[in-house]
Structures are given as C-alpha cells and as structure tokens.
Amino acid sequence: MIPEIGLGTWKYRGGSKPLLRGIELGATFIDTAEMYRTEDQVGEAIRGIRDRIFLATKVSGGNLRHDDVLRAADNSLRLMGVDVIDLYQIHWPNQSVPIRETMRALEELVDRGTVKYIGVSNFSVQQLKEAQNAMSKYPVVSNQVLYNLKSRRIEHDLTPYCEENKITVIAYTPLADGSLAGKSRLLPDKRGAVMEEVAQESGKTPAQVALNWCLTRPPVVVIPKTNSVERTEDNCGATGWRLTADQLQRLDEAFPV
C-alpha cells in the first residue's frame, strides 16, 4: 500500500532535505527515472532508511530491448545504491520494440528479485491492454500519467479502465507546473476565484485543494515535485481530509474535462 502523496523528482535539485522532510510527513513513495538523472540524489537521501521507502524508477523508452532493460535496471540499482526497485516502470511506449520483448525482461527482473512490481507510464488504454496481454506471470500495477485540474483528458477512458482493472494511476504534474499552487500564478478568471473560495472554506492552500481533488478520483495517487522544504510540507498537507461534494462539484464546473 503506497501513500496517497509521493515525491516526484523530475528536474529535482533540492538535495536531501525536502525529500527527507516529505518522508517524515508520510510521503514515503519516491519516484525517479533514469532520464531524470536524479537517481543518485534519491539514493543519497534514502541511505540508511531504505526499508521505509517505496522506491520507483523508470527505464527510458529508448532502452526497451530485452538486454537494454536488464542493463538499465542494473545501472539504476547502482546509482541509487539499493538492491531492489519496488516499482519499475516503462517511461514511454516505443512502437519500434515489441511490447512482449520488454515485458519479458521486466518479468525476468521480478524473478531475479531485483524488482517487486511492474508499471508503465504515459500509456493509453490500448497500449496498457497490450502490455497486460504481453505479461505471462505478473500484473501491470500502475500507469503514471499527466493529471491535474487543468488536464483531465484521462477521465474519458483511462481512469475508468484503471479503476476497473485495479491499476493505480500515478498522477505527475498534479499542480500543473505550479500554476495551481497559489493565487498569484492562477489565471485571472473564474477558475482562480473558485480555487481561492474552496481553499478559504477548507482552511487549506490552493495547492492542497488541487492535490486533494486528484485524490478523490480513484485509483489516483499524486507525486508533486518541489525543491523546497516549505512546499513539501504544504503538499503533504493535502492528505488526511477530503473536499466536500459541493466543493468538488464547483471545482469540476470551473475546470471542465
């Protein structure tokens, strides 16, 4: 069981302190990727507390041939200084590589004990079905995709499919590159006004409202990224409570699909 709020590391340069503070506050799910070039930073931050962390990383879309997957996993393990990756994900689909070849390599990693769970990222429903059909032993447990109040397209088909098939949706960029994190960065229109109203009613910040909205959509968890300890604390305050039905309706109307 992973926490509702994790820690993203795309373009991360905050050092260990924000990650450690997030872990203290219960955000024990950390997501990285070989293409992020932050695996070493994550490894440094979790040194000595590995057993408390659900650690996820990704193999790049250009490394999806069988042997390339195995090499990429070994390199990620080395950079992070760990023996096991909890969740190993395909970062982007690659139509030039047969999905069965990639999935065979991922299943081998599970058999070896160096990977616990297999996931994907940026997969459509059709691509997700193909990945599932290519598996012979283990399930696809997650799909990491863009999702936030301003980008809701996955609600048309992907989130219903994932909920039906017990696949966790890991929402990246849940604050829309920070544009949902505060009044000064919101567009001067109805959306911003509604966000501010709901935040004031809830006694929460706009960022907490935006993240909590995502969490009301099963089966979604979020991985906001920040280089700041203060922002990490703010983000982690988005869990442990829920927006009301009326507040959700107003947000849905202000930010239509």
Model-derived segments and their meaning:
Residues 93-257:
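Beta/alpha (TIM)-barrel catalytic core signal, keyed to glycine-rich beta->alpha loops juxtaposed to Asp/Glu
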Residues 1-53, 178, 256:
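N-terminal binding-site loop/beta-alpha segment at the start of enzyme catalytic domains
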Residues 21-23, 43-52, 74-82, 108-110, ...:
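Acidic (Asp/Glu)-rich catalytic clusters
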Residues 12-23, 65-80, 101, 126-129, ...:
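Short, acidic/polar
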Residues 7, 30, 85, 118, ...:
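Glycine-centered flexible beta-alpha turn that most often forms the glycine-rich phosphate-binding loop
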Residues 80-97:
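Active-site groove signature of glycoside hydrolases
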Residues 12-15, 31-41, 62-67, 94-98, ...:
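Acidic-and-aromatic substrate-binding clefts and catalytic sites of carbohydrate-active enzymes
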Residues 52-64, 87-91, 144-147:
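A short, structured active-site edge motif that brings together acidic residues
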